């Protein structure tokens, strides 16, 4: 996909870098696969802020994505590739031989007109979904299930991929982009290849307003606050933190481990920061 630097006709356009995909569908999404999506503004049911820096932004409709890929043995033709405002990856509209249509995460290199297949008998080709027990070791995969039949939960963002390192018994070892090596049951499904739109990270929004369009509000530095609002706050004039950098609630902000899910600790062979000392 070509990367376009916008002509600097104004200060807000000067730094804009766009990733242009001429193959994207320019019309509306498939109506049967679209649902209403309510914006929370980062608030919970009590109206309290639970996630900071959320609010505003353009209204979105949610596209129903098939993360299970459970229509085995039925060929599906890629009708079109679409933009999805809810994720960094593009999505592909599949039309199955029985007439049903479903959205999937668009894999890298899959074009309009390609025929994809799901199931244990599917060939090893980008976009095909198989149980991990049927995928050769060394294959690059994405959209990986964490529990058989639950649907893909890992490796779904633009340009993401994982490497199938080994299989032993009922578990397979996957190396994720973060460096983490994780065990996954061999009956979990994964899609062959990488996620498309891999140049997403090269774009530049160019101005603060473009971030606001995405529903992201400004982040205020702790040192600019009062001491009642943040541990870094207060002082006369411009001052530093005066301590180890922390969150507004006192949690160390630099390199502190926050993983608390002990139930799945035994599924992690090597943690992502094992080489950081």
UniProtKB/Swiss-Prot annotation:
GO terms for biological process: cytoplasmic translation. Residues 229-241 have a biased composition (Basic and acidic residues). Signal peptide: none annotated. GO terms for cellular component: large ribosomal subunit. One of its GO terms (molecular function) is rRNA binding. Transmembrane segments: none annotated. Pfam families: Ribosomal_L2, Ribosomal_L2_C. The keyword RNA-binding applies. One of the primary rRNA binding proteins. Required for association of the 30S and 50S subunits to form the 70S ribosome, for tRNA binding and peptide bond formation. It has been suggested to have peptidyltransferase activity; this is somewhat controversial. Makes several contacts with the 16S rRNA in the 70S ribosome. Belongs to the universal ribosomal protein uL2 family. PANTHER family: LARGE RIBOSOMAL SUBUNIT PROTEIN UL2M, RIBOSOMAL PROTEIN L2. HAMAP family: Ribosomal_uL2_B (MF_01320_B). This is Large ribosomal subunit protein uL2. It comes from Chromobacterium violaceum (strain ATCC 12472 / DSM 30191 / JCM 1249 / CCUG 213 / NBRC 12614 / NCIMB 9131 / NCTC 9757 / MK). The gene is rplB.
């Amino acid at each position: 996909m070509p990367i376009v630097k916008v002509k600097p006709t104004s200060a807000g356009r000067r730094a804009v870098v766009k990733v242009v995909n001429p193959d994207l569908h320019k019309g509306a999404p498939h109506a049967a696969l679209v649902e209403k999506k309510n914006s929370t503004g980062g608030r919970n049911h009590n109206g309290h802020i639970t996630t900071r820096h959320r609010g505003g932004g353009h209204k979105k409709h949610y596209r129903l994505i098939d993360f299970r890929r459970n229509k085995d043995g039925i060929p599906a033709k890629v009708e079109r590739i679409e933009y999805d405002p809810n994720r960094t990856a593009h999505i592909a509209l599949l039309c199955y031989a029985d007439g049903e249509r479903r959205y999937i995460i668009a894999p890298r290199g899959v074009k309009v007109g390609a025929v994809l297949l799901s199931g244990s008998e599917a060939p090893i080709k980008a976009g095909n979904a198989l149980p991990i027990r049927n995928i050769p070791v060394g294959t690059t995969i994405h959209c990986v299930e964490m529990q058989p039949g639950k649907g893909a939960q890992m490796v779904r963002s633009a340009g993401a991929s994982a490497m199938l390192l080994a299989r032993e018994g009922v578990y397979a070892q996957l190396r994720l982009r973060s460096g983490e090596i994780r065990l996954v049951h061999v009956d979990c499904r994964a899609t062959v290849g990488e996620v498309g739109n891999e140049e997403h990270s090269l774009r530049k929004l160019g101005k603060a307003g473009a971030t606001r369009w995405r529903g992201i509000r400004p982040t205020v530095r702790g040192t600019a606050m009062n001491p009642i609002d943040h541990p870094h706050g207060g002082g006369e004039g411009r001052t530093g933190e005066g301590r180890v950098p922390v969150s507004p609630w006192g949690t160390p902000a630099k390199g502190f481990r926050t993983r608390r899910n002990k139930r799945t600790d035994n599924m992690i062979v090597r943690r992502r920061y094992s080489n950081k000392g």
